[in-house]
């Protein structure tokens, strides 16, 4: 057979994958759409591709090469490759949509691709076992229901109105999986052509079509870890708004390692954000006791923001934690986790990083005290919701409950109603520890925060005492963001566990000393952090000032002389 011109430069399917990171399913999809035509080479008619044809398509779609993606023979990405791949999907939208907004669209598409590919895998597995298409399609053989007209291939083959088709598919998926997927896609509108021209959505679809996201190729742990990475990257990208849905994992780790979840614990986050605290609790127990026991945890969370609620739900699903109960609503005015008699449900562990110092909140509804949250306490200020969150958390702890909450430092020392609430919490012996964190740990703010640990069942040795820890100096400095290192986390946790004084770092304070200090919990009041006060030599300073003044006078005279010479 005559050799095709330039045959030596043609690429096989596996070579295309190695060179360009393009999955064979993506190639076939391009062939169906007429974007590329393979050459038939050799006696067997092997399919080969011209590199220049592939480069043209990739340039048109702005697909990035050299991601280090695996060959198409196994189609599996490792964690680093998966992180890169997912972050590249954001590049397609970056600059077209506000950085704080496009994350939910990426997450929505990723989740849709995942459940569609998993459905296909489940179908093929059951079909191979029973040889019956009806059984293979049966609802009970699938974790999520994906109707035929909702499969990923449907949007792959849609040419004109992809955005509208996606909206229709998300509605159908929600209905087919209600109440499991209720509200998850409600904040997405791909049909807005000002935001999403057809070409932009097509590029997103083509990008996600490169690889299968089924369980065979990407495990729940791998995809879950990559999803959490993506959340963190979006938080960094969004700046100040990033702090609204993301708490640094190191801070979550401090609190969870202090509270130490046990098998079958009920864990609640009243301001769940993207779900990081709940997942950290799961990861903690998985590390210390194994996955089987970690999956016995009961996880609960409430989130007021619709888009963030969807992100949290997807986060749980991608980690395989389908039983996690995430509800949408305002925790302070409309708490969702209630007992049959309408009272607040209580939990073994409560965790939260609520929004700081909200001025506009449903104070009047809270004051009505429907859930008994201010019984025994004063009403928090109408212009600051910090202690409203604290009192909600305290009321949500069961009789043996432990809790950890991230708060602004003002909560530790402000007076008025807040001071009286703090006094009562201390007298009720509910506060176990206060930990001052370094500045610039949180996205969008350089203000340092504190962690307050509550315990309704203190050990005898800790009753009537509060441990104050000053961890402000222990961190790794970054350009825009500081981080707690592993050793910093371990130091905080071990100090809490030992509950003993550590010079210039921690002090155990009794109720008498707190009372003498008017129940002020300001960390600097109790812990000398090692900063030596600068000794000022007044005489030397005056001498330096006199020299500076003489130099200034001489400069003024020169300026006056110049002005005279210029005849101004």
Predicted regions and their residues:
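A generic secondary-structure signal for well-formed alpha-helical elements
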Residues: 113-126, 234, 285, 289, ...
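Alpha-helix initiation/capping motif
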Residues: 75, 194-197, 215-219, 244, ...
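Non-catalytic, mostly N-terminal accessory regions of nucleic-acid modification and defense proteins
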Residues: 2, 6-10, 15, 19-25, ...
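Residues embedded in well-ordered secondary-structure elements
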Residues: 5, 288-290, 441
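A conserved structural/catalytic subdomain of Rossmann-like adenosyl-cofactor enzymes
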Residues: 51, 61-72, 341-568
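Generic helix-packing signal
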Residues: 20, 93-94, 230, 260, ...
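Conserved S-adenosyl-L-methionine
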Residues: 241-352, 357-368, 373-377, 387-388, ...
């Amino acid at each position: 057979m005559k050799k095709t011109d330039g045959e030596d430069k043609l690429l096989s399917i596996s070579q295309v994958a190695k060179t360009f990171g393009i999955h064979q399913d993506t190639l076939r999809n391009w062939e169906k759409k007429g974007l590329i035509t393979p050459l038939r080479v050799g006696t067997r008619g092997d399919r080969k591709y011209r590199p220049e044809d592939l480069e043209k398509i990739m340039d048109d779609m702005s697909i990035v090469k050299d991601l280090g993606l695996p060959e198409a023979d196994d189609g599996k990405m490792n964690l680093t490759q998966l992180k890169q791949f997912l972050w590249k999907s954001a590049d397609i939208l970056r600059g077209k949509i506000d950085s704080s907004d496009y994350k939910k669209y990426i997450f929505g598409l990723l989740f849709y691709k995942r459940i569609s590919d998993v459905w296909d895998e489940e179908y093929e597995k059951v079909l191979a076992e029973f040889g019956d298409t009806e059984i293979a399609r049966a609802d009970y053989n699938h974790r999520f229901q994906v109707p035929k007209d909702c499969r990923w291939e449907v949007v792959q083959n849609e040419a004109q109105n992809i955005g509208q088709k996606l909206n229709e598919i998300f509605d159908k998926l929600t209905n087919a999986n209600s109440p499991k997927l209720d509200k998850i896609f409600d904040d997405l509108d791909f049909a807005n052509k000002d935001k999403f021209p057809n070409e932009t959505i097509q590029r997103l679809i083509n990008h996600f079509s490169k690889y299968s996201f089924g369980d065979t190729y990407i495990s729940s742990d791998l995809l879950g870890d990559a999803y959490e990475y993506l959340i963190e990257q979006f938080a960094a990208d969004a700046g100040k708004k990033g702090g609204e849905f993301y708490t640094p994992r190191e801070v979550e780790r401090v609190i969870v390692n202090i509270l130490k979840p046990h098998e079958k614990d009920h864990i609640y986050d009243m301001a769940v954000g993207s779900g990081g605290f709940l997942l950290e609790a799961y990861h903690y127990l998985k590390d210390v006791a194994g996955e089987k026991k970690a999956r016995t945890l009961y996880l609960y969370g409430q989130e007021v923001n619709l888009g963030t609620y969807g992100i949290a739900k997807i986060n749980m699903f991608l980690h395989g934690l389908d039983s996690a109960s995430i509800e949408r609503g305002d925790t302070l005015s409309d708490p969702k986790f209630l007992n049959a008699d309408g009272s607040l449900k209580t939990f073994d562990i409560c965790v939260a990083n609520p929004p700081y110092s909200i001025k506009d909140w449903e104070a009047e509804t809270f004051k009505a005290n429907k859930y008994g949250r201010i019984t025994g306490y004063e009403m928090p200020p109408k212009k600051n919701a910090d202690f409203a969150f604290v009192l909600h958390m305290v009321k949500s702890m069961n009789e043996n409950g432990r809790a950890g909450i991230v708060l602004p430092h003002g909560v530790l020392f402000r007076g008025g109603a807040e001071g009286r609430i703090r006094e009562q919490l201390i007298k009720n012996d509910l506060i176990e520890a206060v930990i001052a964190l370094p500045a610039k740990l949180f996205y969008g703010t350089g203000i340092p925060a504190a962690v307050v640990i509550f315990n309704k069942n203190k050990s005898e040795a800790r009753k009537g005492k509060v441990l104050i820890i000053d961890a402000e100096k222990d961190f790794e400095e970054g350009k825009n963001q500081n981080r707690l290192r592993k050793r910093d986390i371990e130091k905080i946790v071990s100090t809490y566990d030992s509950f003993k004084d550590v010079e210039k770092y921690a002090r155990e304070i009794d109720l008498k000393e707190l009372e003498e200090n008017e129940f002020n919990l300001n960390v600097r009041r109790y812990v000398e952090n090692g900063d030596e006060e600068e000794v000022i030599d007044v005489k030397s300073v005056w001498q330096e000032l006199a020299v500076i003044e003489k130099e200034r006078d001489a400069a003024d005279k020169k300026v006056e002389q110049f002005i005279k010479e210029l005849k101004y």
